Amino acid sequence: MRMTMEEMKNEAETTSMVSMPLYAVMYPVFNELERVNLSAAQTLRAAFIKAEKENPGLTQDIIMKILEKKSVEVNFTESLLRMAADDVEEYMIERPEPEFQDLNEKARALKQILSKIPDEINDRVRFLQTIKDIASAIKELLDTVNNVFKKYQYQNRRALEHQKKEFVKYSKSFSDTLKTYFKDGKAINVFISANRLIHQTNLILQTFKTVA
């Protein structure tokens, strides 16, 4: 049975999403290890990247097994959200023009606000302010994306437009999740949706970095 284009896109999105723990959890570990043993850290990083590429979700499985073995009870989705604000070198745009650096900055700002959700969600007043801040950060990021579109011409504009549409789709999904949360109080769904939005934010940077 052949998959439709939409199903293929959804599968690709799910596959890359399960790899989120590689850069959110393991990259900071590799960075710390580099200070002690640069060669070992680089070898380990390369091995994890290769293994994750061939078996998406492997890093998450390894982390979960370690936590299970140590009998550590942790909400992995919440913890992932808390850690996902850090810059990931592989996604950062290196072009020096102000518009591109502004794109890095706006993406960073959105991720940092989203990562604070677990700390704010139980305080209704603070959480409502956080939601407003997220909405503003989303708008600012999209405005910056549009500014780059206006100023620079791309051969692969279709890929950029597609990624922008995906980001908008997940932004709306996040908004819908918030509305549901205020009815059912299930914070875990907000954390999942926020992680997806952070992932889409990283993919915007990655797409611009690839074609720019």
Curated annotation (Swiss-Prot):
Instruction: List, in alphabetical order, the Gene Ontology terms for molecular function in this entry.
Output: protein homodimerization activity
Q: Which InterPro entries match?
A: PDC10_dimerisation_sf, PDCD10, PDCD10_N
Q: Does this UniProt record's set of keywords contain Membrane? A: yes
GO BP annotations listed: angiogenesis; cellular response to leukemia inhibitory factor; endothelium development; establishment of Golgi localization; Golgi reassembly; intrinsic apoptotic signaling pathway in response to hydrogen peroxide; negative regulation of apoptotic process; negative regulation of blood vessel endothelial cell proliferation involved in sprouting angiogenesis
Subcellular localization is given as:
Cytoplasm; Golgi apparatus membrane; Cell membrane
Effect of gene knockout = Lethal at an early embryonic stage due to defects in angiogenesis, vasculogenesis and hematopoiesis. Mice exhibit low levels of KDR/VEGFR2.
Q: Cross-link of type Glycyl lysine isopeptide (Lys-Gly) (interchain with G-Cter in SUMO2): positions? A: 186
N6-acetyllysine occurs at: 179
Primary location class: cytoplasm
Keyword set for this entry?
Answer: Acetylation, Angiogenesis, Apoptosis, Cell membrane, Cytoplasm, Golgi apparatus, Isopeptide bond, Membrane, Ubl conjugation
Which superkingdom does the taxonomy of this entry point to? Eukaryota
What is one GO cellular-component annotation here?
A: cytosol
Topology versus the membrane:
Peripheral membrane protein
Protein purpose: Promotes cell proliferation. Modulates apoptotic pathways. Increases mitogen-activated protein kinase activity and STK26 activity. Important for cell migration, and for normal structure and assembly of the Golgi complex. Part of the striatin-interacting phosphatase and kinase (STRIPAK) complexes. STRIPAK complexes have critical roles in protein (de)phosphorylation and are regulators of multiple signaling pathways including Hippo, MAPK, nuclear receptor and cytoskeleton remodeling.
Give the UniProt family note. Belongs to the PDCD10 family.
Q: How does it assemble?
A: Homodimer. Interacts (via C-terminus) with CCM2. Interacts (via C-terminus) with PXN. Interacts (via N-terminus) with STK25. Interacts (via N-terminus) with STK26. Interacts (via N-terminus) with STK24. Interacts with GOLGA2. Identified in a complex with KRIT1 and CCM2. Interacts with KDR/VEGFR2. Interaction with KDR/VEGFR2 is enhanced by stimulation with VEGFA. Interacts with RIPOR1 (via C-terminus); this interaction is required for the association of RIPOR1 with either STK24 and STK26 kinases and occurs in a Rho-independent manner.
**Identification of the protein by name:** Programmed cell death protein 10
In its UniProt entry, the species of origin is given as Mus musculus
